[in-house]
Structures are given as structure tokens and as C-alpha cells.
Swiss-Prot record:
Lineage of the organism: Bacteria, Pseudomonadati, Pseudomonadota, Betaproteobacteria, Burkholderiales
Positions of transmembrane segments: 7-27, 29-49, 141-161, 177-197
Pfam families, per database record: Peptidase_M48
UniProt name for this protein: Protease HtpX homolog
Enzyme Commission no: 3.4.24.-
Length: 288
């Protein structure tokens, strides 16, 4: 119920922002058109955003024949978590990362890059995929899918406002400065909405992953490795579609310093510290 409420709040907030941008582009008619588009896009997001995200990241589906060890690992963790077997995908990217998508546990997919399989031990990979399956179990993946789709739409509308301007409710051209401000501020606002929910969601998935794998230390080590390797290895598909970055186990586009304040993910060092504390004190479900 809590995750359903989070989804509703996120969809309502981003829909409202979408309508406001539409109003600045075309007055009352623009708001009405934006509202109709938002309803359609939310419907589309619910049913098809997982397919879009997998296509954006160039993910290729695998099975027990094409990727036997990885597929078996996901199946073992799924059974332990009490979840239906998700579809399994690999992404031909050296950047180490992973994500989950799909509207519910019965229609879920998990994906990992070739890079993450190369750098992690089997124990660490179990921790990562357990984290992703925790997202599935918590039904967080719908939030990520809707956020990615709507954030991309808001950015597109904002860019349209910057280059083509818009009209007010009386049909007069908008102030170009106002259009520029919309182009700058609307995507930032969309990111802040995502950030307010995503950080807590990642902590929950870390804890849930520790429960599924019974090994928070392995996930902590995996996060450290992914963080260190990702610094010099660009995730090309995510750079082309930055709206998908917030779905990854670590945001590949996050910078340090002040930019960390606007990240959809908590600081890696904080996540690692929490997991190591859980491992040391046995403060996680499934601990002996």
C-alpha cells in the first residue's frame, strides 16, 4: 500500500508539472492538451515503459542456454525471494550496472551489463541481483518506469518551449525569457520529484537485497566496485537516454560535490556504511 501511494504521488506530481509546462506553451488549450497527453502517457507508461527502457539500453534477453550461470543465479534468488521468475537481460556495455523494470512481479525484467558480470565475483553478483529483485518485490519498478517516461516527456516539452516559445491564454506569444526559464527549471523540478522518492527506495532495496541474499557485505563490496569502475567507463546507452539513469543500481551520470545533492541515488559511501553495519551487527532480516 505504501509503494502504491508513492507511485500515485509521483505520477500526480509529474503530471502536474507536465500540465504547467503545457500551459506556458499554449495557455488554457495547452494545459488541456498537456493533461490529455499526461493521461495517455501514464497509461502508456504502466503498460509499455518496461519495453521502452529495455530498448533504450539495448538490452538483449537471455535464457538458460545463452547465459546459463547468470540465469541460474537469478532463478535461485527469485525462488528464495518467493517471486515469479523474471525475464533476464544482458546489456553489451563495459560500464558496470544493473536494473529492474516491469509493472509488477508477474511482469518483471532484470538486466545487467556485461561489465558488471566481468568485475564482480559470484557472491557480489548475487548481492546486486538480490537488490534488483528487492525492487521487484517492493513493486518499486513501476515508480522507476513511470518516472523515466514522464521525465523524458517533460524535458522534451521544455526544449520545445526554449526553441519555439509558446502562447498565453489569450493567444499572445510568451516572453522568451519565461520560455527559457521553463526549459531550465522544468527538468530540474522533475529530477527533484524523482530524487525525493528514489533515495529512500534505494535504501529499502539494499535492505531487501540483504534479506534475499543473506549477505549485506557482498552487496556493499559490489557497490564499491561498481562505483570505482564506473568513474572511467561511460554507460553509452544511459548517456543517450539520461532519463533511465535513475533506474540503475548506481546512477552512472552522478557527479560529486554539489551535484550529489541532486542525485536520485544516496551517496555510495553511505549505502556501503549502512550495509556493513547490518553485516557486523546482524541487523537485517535473514541474519543468523
Amino acid at each position: 500500500m505504501f509503494n502504491f501511494a508513492k507511485t500515485a504521488v509521483l505520477m500526480a506530481a509529474i503530471t502536474a508539472l507536465f500540465i504547467v509546462v503545457g500551459g506556458m506553451l499554449g495557455g488554457e488549450q495547452g494545459m488541456l492538451m498537456a493533461l490529455l497527453m499526461a493521461v495517455g502517457m501514464n497509461f502508456f507508461s504502466y503498460w509499455f515503459s518496461d519495453t521502452m527502457v529495455l530498448k533504450m539500453t539495448n538490452a538483449q534477453q537471455v535464457d538458460e542456454r545463452s547465459a546459463p550461470q547468470f540465469y541460474a543465479l537469478v532463478r535461485e534468488l527469485s525462488e528464495k525471494a518467493g517471486l515469479p521468475m523474471p525475464k533476464v537481460f544482458l546489456i553489451d556495455e563495459d560500464a558496470p550496472n544493473a536494473f529492474a523494470t516491469g509493472r509488477n512481479p508477474d511482469n518483471a525484467s532484470v538486466a545487467a551489463t556485461i561489465g558488471v558480470l566481468k568485475i564482480l565475483s559470484n557472491r557480489e553478483l548475487r548481492g546486486v541481483m538480490a537488490h534488483e529483485l528487492a525492487h521487484v518485490r517492493h513493486r518499486d519498478i513501476l515508480i522507476s518506469a513511470v518516472a523515466a517516461t514522464m521525465a523524458g516527456a517533460i524535458s522534451a516539452l521544455a526544449n520545445f518551449a526554449m526553441f519555439f516559445g509558446g502562447r498565453d491564454s489569450e493567444g499572445r506569444p510568451n516572453n522568451p525569457i519565461a520560455s527559457l526559464m521553463v526549459a531550465i527549471l522544468a527538468p530540474i523540478a522533475a529530477s527533484l520529484i524523482q530524487m525525493s522518492i528514489s533515495r529512500a527506495r534505494e535504501y529499502e532495496a539494499d535492505r531487501g537485497g540483504a534479506e534475499i541474499s543473506s549477505d549485506p557485505e557482498a552487496l556493499a563490496h559490489a557497490l564499491e566496485k561498481i562505483h570505482n569502475y564506473a568513474q572511467g567507463t561511460p554507460f553509452q546507452a544511459v548517456e543517450q537516454h539520461p532519463e533511465t539513469a535513475q533506474m540503475m543500481i548506481l546512477n552512472p551520470l552522478t557527479a560529486g560535490g554539489l551535484a550529489q545533492l541532486f542525485s536520485t541515488h544516496p551517496p555510495t559511501e553511505e549505502r556501503v556504511a549502512r550495509l556493513m553495519h547490518m553485516a557486523k551487527n546482524g541487523e537485517y532480516p535473514g541474519a543468523n
